[in-house]
Amino acid sequence: MQYSGVDSETYAREALPRFKPKRGKAETWVKLAKEAGCVYTILTSRHHEGFNMFDSKFSDFNVKTTKGVDIVKEYAEACKKYGMKAGYYFSLLDWSHPDYDPTGSGISYPKGNYEAQKQGRRQFGNHEKYKDYLYNIFNELLTSYAPVDLVWWDFSQPGFQGDKAWNATALMKNLFEKNPKAIQNNRLYHSANHLSEGGIRVTPAWKGDYSTAEHHIPATGINGDWEACQTLNGTWGYSADNQEWKTSQALIRELIDTVSRGGNFLLNIGPMPDGSIPPESIRIFKEIGFWMKKNGEAIYGTRANPLNIELTWGRLTRKGEDITYIFVYDKPDNGELTIPCSFEGDVKAVLLGGEKTVNMSQDKTSNTPPFYIINMKMETAATGINVMGKRMIHKRSA
């Protein structure tokens, strides 16, 4: 809608007849996510155009128009069936609501709506009333589709955030009263949004549980808990015109990069108008799932790279005090992986997915740090190695 240049009414008139979700599709989404190794999922409950993907008594612009298919209800039931945490993307914006007023906020608003306002076909209403509406539909989501385990708010700007724009305190209070174990990102406030390739400002914890990086992975991670979200091609929603699919190998590297820098990885799928997942998306998710079955222990429950440097040939993650995982992207020509650290106690290295031990030795040359050197025959890219040894110690040369 933002790119089409039309107003909300024209967009709804053109788009809704094409939106024909079939029953049972939400379960296929959750099942595929489970097979790919995901432990939580996030469904777009509503986006900026204001269409609610659940039945609401506060708005007629919702799934009542889709022949009775309550997508959020099916999704919530599927999450329970497959043991997945149920998260929801929830747009704070609503381009269709008559009381939503973004004037002077710096937040994106369709050009078509501004044109309609100039022509007298559309007027901005009372934004205080809109905040009441926002609270009411969010409360519907919390009460009718419980449990809501995660909320992915979107989004704010410097002059339009928090209580002023969204009555954020009341929204957060309602979430935690309904589910004290729920978590949320911090996009109810502006500083939660990514600023550039160079980094992200982190808001205080009371403004959200984690930060979000959109379409990039910060080179040094982000202080505190964070998540990187990425697409399979160049779009978030389904686009028949965009067939520039990323390879599963490239996305696995992005997953590893994210985890090795202390973050979670959220990978987006844009279903087709009937709810079917594009074949290429299915293929990519299944390939990632195959890799995760072999290497998942180096992803789940791990911490960021314990060294203060990033290796040129791969990445590291750490679990507890005894295990370091090594991901090999590009094997050096001499077949040796040099790690500038030492381990306390006995050390052993094995390939993940088996018990095959790889040779590991320590370079004790006096004029260098105590490097550990692993000699191995790399079978595939992003091969995982489990190094079992007590506390890793990074040494700097003088």
Where do the PLM segments sit?
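Mature catalytic domains of secreted/periplasmic carbohydrate-active enzymes
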Residues: 1-398
